[in-house]
């Protein structure tokens, strides 16, 4: 019997949510009695796009090259996102599945735009302005004519980046892909729980409603599996990427860089030149230098950041150099420094005063709760699975999130590359 695998990543679901989830009908029908990991250790930064790339590559950000949601561009008040798969530097589970002869699908899985080895693709993306259309937007990100016809069918329920409308859309698109094409590997990423935490806090009635919605999403997908006659051969994995922590303020550190002369503005308050720039990742931030080889600017920036950290009022608990974050947290890239939150501050990008701001729920980084912090902080992500590849009623202890890709691969009968960072959770598999 050829097995199939569905990965449903419920963004920002945490272990504390499972007590409610386990009372709900679709968990009981499709996941109860399977396997569960007590503690999944995620990556740094605890941000959706880097984590999901680690989930499918089995590698840390220093290898796969995704270390934030955004495609860094200086001077923009709204940064573009890293939607396209071209940013990923390592083979992922979709690449290896195709090499093994499997069919593949992904719906709203991060950083999969124009992925050549996903047969049925609906990238996490949205129209880029009032002139753009849903059809053209998803076509631009690699959706095939067959998938575009499904997207067109459900467009009326798609609310751009507004939850749960966009989640209802993606779940129905995924369900139709199951019934029409029966992919061997399907990865899905609803983000309703994540959005509710950003908007209302880590543990609130709205978050509980999101857990109930997620159970219903499981039911919609698995009903499609049953209608396709595939239940006995399908493995379902419910995972997540990170938790969140409540914060009390947002702090715009680029204001301090302007005051230090490291960012220079024109008469309209826009950036005309820069030496250093702080890009928020929510509860952490990356600091870029225009010329990383300029030792004078590097030292000036480091001295400023160390001073802000030492004062204890600017939201920074630790300043990492790129070399330190690469060595200690496997976070490396073309930035020069990483700033870690003090546990109650989130960072924002603005270079204009005021320095300290209240919540702005239009940006995931500046809501009532956020993430991006070191992976040992806050509530932790989940891993549950049930199906013919997995043991029954088995619990395991701590695993790094990079162990998920090789585990998924083994469940489908193939291997990830030898030089990945993760190892399969063999104790969970039959």
Q: Across the structure, where does each feature detected by a protein language model lie?
A:
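Beta-strand elements within well-structured catalytic alpha/beta cores of enzymes
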Residues: 2-16, 29-30, 55, 97, ...
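A structural signal for well-ordered alpha-helical segments within the folded catalytic domains
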Residues: 3, 24-25, 50, 88-95, ...
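Short catalytic/ligand-binding loop motif for oxyanion handling, primarily in non-cytosolic enzymes
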Residues: 15-17, 49, 112-119, 194-198, ...
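Short, structured active-site-proximal loop/turn typified by the sulfatase FGly-forming signature C/S-X-P-X-R
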Residues: 18-62, 105
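A structural signal for short, well-ordered beta-strand segments and their strand-loop junctions
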Residues: 39, 103-108, 185-189, 238, ...
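Secreted, luminal/periplasmic, and some membrane-associated catalytic domains
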Residues: 71, 75-86, 90, 95, ...
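Substrate-binding rim/cap in mid-to-C-terminal beta-strand-loop elements of soluble/periplasmic
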Residues: 262, 266-296, 366-411
């Amino acid at each position: 019997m050829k097995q199939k695998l569905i990965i449903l990543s419920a963004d920002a679901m945490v272990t504390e949510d499972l007590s409610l989830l386990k009372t709900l009908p679709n968990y009981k029908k499709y996941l109860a009695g399977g396997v569960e990991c007590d503690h999944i250790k995620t990556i740094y930064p605890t941000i959706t796009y880097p984590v999901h790339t680690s989930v499918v590559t089995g590698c840390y950000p220093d290898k796969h090259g995704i270390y934030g949601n955004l495609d860094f561009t200086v001077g923009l008040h709204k940064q573009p996102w890293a939607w396209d798969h071209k940013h990923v530097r390592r083979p992922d589970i979709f690449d290896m599945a195709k090499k093994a002869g499997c069919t593949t699908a992904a719906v709203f899985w991060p950083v999969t735009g124009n992925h050549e080895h996903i047969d049925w693709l609906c990238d996490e993306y949205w129209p880029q302005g009032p002139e753009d259309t849903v059809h053209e937007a998803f076509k631009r990100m690699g959706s095939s004519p067959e998938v575009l016809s499904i997207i067109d069918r459900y467009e009326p329920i798609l609310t751009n980046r507004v939850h749960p409308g966009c989640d209802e859309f993606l779940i129905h698109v995924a369900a139709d892909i199951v019934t029409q094409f029966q992919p061997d590997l399907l990865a899905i990423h609803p983000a309703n729980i994540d959005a509710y935490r950003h908007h209302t806090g880590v543990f609130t009635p709205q978050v509980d409603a999101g857990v109930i919605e997620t159970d219903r999403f499981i039911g919609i997908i698995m009903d499609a599996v049953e209608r396709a006659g595939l239940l006995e051969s399908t493995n379902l994995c419910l995972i997540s990427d990170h938790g969140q922590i409540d914060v009390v303020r947002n702090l715009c550190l680029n204001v301090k860089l302007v005051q230090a002369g490291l960012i220079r503005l024109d008469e309209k308050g826009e950036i005309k030149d820069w030496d250093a720039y702080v890009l928020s990742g929510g509860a952490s931030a990356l600091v870029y230098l225009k010329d990383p080889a300029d030792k004078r600017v590097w030292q000036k920036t480091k001295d400023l950041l160390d001073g802000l950290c030492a004062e204890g009022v600017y939201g920074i608990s630790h300043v990492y150099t790129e070399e330190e974050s690469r060595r200690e947290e496997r976070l490396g890239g073309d930035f020069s420094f990483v700033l870690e939150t003090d546990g109650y501050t989130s960072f924002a990008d603005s270079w204009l005063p005021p320095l300290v701001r209240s919540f702005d729920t239009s940006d995931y980084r500046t809501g009532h709760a956020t993430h991006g912090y070191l992976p040992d902080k806050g509530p932790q992500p989940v891993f549950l699975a049930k199906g013919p590849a997995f043991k029954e009623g088995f619990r395991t202890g701590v695993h790094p999130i990079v162990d998920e890709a090789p585990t998924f691969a083994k469940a489908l009968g193939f291997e990830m590359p030898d030089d990945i960072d993760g190892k399969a959770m063999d104790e969970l598999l039959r």
